[in-house]
Design a protein with these regions (language model features):
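N-terminal single-pass transmembrane signal-anchor helix
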Residues: 9-36
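Structured surface patches comprising rigid loops and adjacent beta-strands/short helices at the edges
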Residues: 73, 143-156
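Short beta-strand segments
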Residues: 113-115, 141-143, 189-193
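Short aromatic-glycine motifs in intrinsically disordered, low-complexity regions
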Residues: 131-143
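Short linear sequence signals and composition-biased patches located at protein termini or domain-edge surfaces
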Residues: 150-205
């Protein structure tokens, strides 16, 4: 009678095999989590950079538009008195004021408005008054262009030299600077805007 030999195959897993599988699974999950977190962080950083770049570009366009459309007429104070200047700028006060032509959908009022740029609470702020000669110092539309601004410097070119205020003397009261420069730091990055007003004539009464 032939001898029958049978083999018993254990289809289950041993405790060691289960533990090894759990360790491998944990490592896979950890690596996947790290990769996912890194991808999300990269996406957030990219999104922030795009937003900052977009904000910078838009702000630059607005500032350049205002300055290139400057109207060379004497400014008045809130009492209607002439200020002996067609543009007033002071790097110490971090402020520049002038009249500019602003596009409007309404034909009921003059397109010439008083525009003011200044550093306020570490932000580059644009104020647009409702007329070229406002009598109410609080009647304006305010726009925060750039936040977290440090070391803002405003300078004005005349006779190939930069000056930190305008007008620099009586001879420059009726003219516009050749160039206007904004230098500032945002998020530890330095930026420089140099804008040409495109006005080479003096105001005459």
């Amino acid at each position: 009678m032939p001898l029958k030999v049978s083999f018993h195959m254990n289809k289950g897993f041993t405790l060691i095999e289960i533990l090894i599988s759990l360790v491998i699974l944990s490592v896979i999950l950890l690596v996947t989590s790290i990769i996912l977190e890194s991808s999300l962080e990269t996406e957030r950083n990219l999104s922030n950079r795009l937003e900052e770049s977009s904000s910078l570009n838009l702000s630059s366009i607005i500032v350049k538009r205002d300055i290139r459309q400057i109207i060379n007429v004497p400014l008045r104070d809130y009492y209607g008195e002439f200020l002996q200047a067609t543009i007033i700028g002071d790097d110490v006060q971090k402020k520049i004021s002038f009249n500019s032509k602003v596009n409007s959908l309404s034909n009921d009022s003059s397109p010439v408005k008083r525009i003011e740029y200044l550093l306020e609470d570490n932000s580059l702020v644009r104020k647009q008054y409702f007329s070229a000669n406002p009598y109410d110092s609080e009647a304006y539309i305010k726009l925060n262009l750039l936040k977290d601004i440090t070391n803002l410097e405003i300078s004005f070119m005349h006779n190939k030299r930069w000056h930190n205020k305008w007008p620099i003397n009586k001879n420059t009261e009726n003219i516009i600077p050749t160039l206007i420069q904004f230098e500032f730091v945002q998020d530890n990055k330095e930026y420089t805007w140099i804008i040409e007003p495109n006005i080479d004539y003096a105001y005459k009464n």
